[in-house]
């Protein structure tokens, strides 16, 4: 999902396959341990990609990720290197919340192809 986010963030269209034979190789999500990991999201595409990556990695270890969006420019702020304006953190936060719901619904079970596709769509919607 990290690579997916980077490619989307750089304006590249992305297609992928969610075949069951590959999804079956993914581990089950661990039971929630009650542990939380605080992550400050950096204001660049790599920071956004890392936030999705760490959210999934933590979920496999039973850890819930709590995000701090304070470093992200507000909506409408100019983007100096790429032109245009910043979207703000709201779409990213919405994607994190939606992905967390999928993760919460799958504790101690395995993802299916719809889960993976939904996660990818939430990421694309944020980028």
Give residue spans per PLM region:
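Extended catalytic cores of very large enzyme megasubunits
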Residues: 1-127
